[in-house]
UniProtKB/Swiss-Prot annotation:
The gene is trpD. It comes from Nocardioides sp. (strain ATCC BAA-499 / JS614). This is Anthranilate phosphoribosyltransferase. Belongs to the anthranilate phosphoribosyltransferase family. Its EC number is 2.4.2.18. GO terms for molecular function: anthranilate phosphoribosyltransferase activity; magnesium ion binding.
């Protein structure tokens, strides 16, 4: 059994905590037992010290223990970014999820409303006509019927509401900002995760490795929480409990360099229209970014043990075919219809 003075004292002294200690702290927070001051102190002290794989794993373990369960058969894929890059870009991961589903992956996307941008994944999906208030059993059925479903984080991790006030009042990013992509409630087997924070990206990769998940964690060298098309990206490739690091250059895949402004988005209605134009066949910088990120997701889903440069070539080709054949557009149409029933 830990205590708050013990946990906070260790963090203030710069000492690392065990997974058991962070799991205890998260249990206090998510049960409503921790005070606002204790939650804020823990969040800031852990962030200031710098998180370890073991510490974040303890937080993740507790979140999973208290999450609303959802059971979806088959090999599952999630594509999500941490946010926080302040790029105000279009919803690349959401579009990539639809394209990956069009290519045959079974996608269970875990996401939330916007925190630091104008439109989060939940916001744009609502604007596209997808209902978010369905029970877990129906969401699982939709995944099987359509090939994609969406788990709204607030519904599947309801105990996180206890951390909402201190997080909002702090007004700065903390470790909590990185937990959503690590806690897909369907326990997706393959994950393509964008992380804007260069310190946290390898930590997130380590958490996936510890859990035995196949994952690609990446960060654009321009700071984007995606595989970027404006320059190169760093990639942490997770398979078999091991993490390897490499780089991705879109030029190697025949993708032209883009200007940063070409990926800038707007509010949910604007970004939903960008999705529709992409699926209708519009070419350009947005399509290139989506093809690259959907290709990465398909690579980790289909070929997790292959070298990234080889798997990415095949993944990008499948992503292009998903768009060009109309398969991705049909996925969205079926998804909207399925959530309306």
């Amino acid at each position: 059994m830990s205590t708050w003075p013990e946990v906070l004292g260790a963090l203030v002294a710069g000492s690392d905590l065990s997974a058991d200690q962070t799991a205890w702290a998260m249990g206090e927070i998510l049960s409503g037992e921790a005070t606002v001051a204790q939650i804020a102190g823990f969040a800031i002290a852990l962030r200031a010290k710098g998180e370890t794989v073991e510490e974040v794993s303890g937080l993740v373990d507790t979140m999973y223990a208290l999450a609303t369960p959802i059971s979806v058969p088959g090999r599952l894929l999630d594509i999500v970014g941490t946010g926080g890059d302040r790029s105000m870009s279009v919803n690349i991961s959401t579009m990539s999820a639809i394209v990956a589903a069009g290519a045959g992956a079974r996608v269970v996307k875990h996401g939330n409303r916007s925190a630091s941008s104008q439109s989060g994944s939940a916001d744009v999906l609502e604007s596209l006509g997808i209902r978010l208030d369905l029970p877990a059993a129906r969401l699982a059925e939709i995944a099987a019927e359509v090939g994609i479903t969406f788990c709204f984080a607030a519904a599947f991790h309801p105990a996180m509401r206890y951390a909402a006030v201190p997080r909002r009042e702090l007004g700065v990013g903390t470790t909590f900002n990185f937990l959503g992509p690590l806690t897909n409630p369907a326990h997706a087997h393959a994950q393509a995760i964008g992380c804007a924070d260069p310190r946290m990206a390898p930590v997130m990769a380590g958490v996936f490795a510890r859990r035995g998940v196949d994952a690609w964690v990446f960060r654009g060298d321009d700071g984007l929480d995606e595989l970027t098309t404006t320059t190169t990206s760093r990639l942490w490739w997770v398979h078999g409990g091991e993490v390897r690091e490499t780089s991705v250059d879109p030029a190697d895949l025949g993708i032209a360099r883009a200007e940063a402004g070409a990926l800038r988005g707007g509010d949910a209605a604007h970004n939903a229209e960008v999705v529709r134009r992409l699926l209708a066949g519009e070419t350009g910088a947005v399509r290139d970014a989506v093809v690259l990120n959907a290709g990465a997701a398909l690579a980790v889903y289909d070929e997790p043990g292959s070298a990234p440069d080889q798997a990415l070539v095949a993944g990008v080709e499948r992503a292009r075919e998903s768009l060009d054949s109309g398969a991705a557009a049909r996925v969205l149409d079926r998804w909207v219809a399925a959530t309306a029933r």
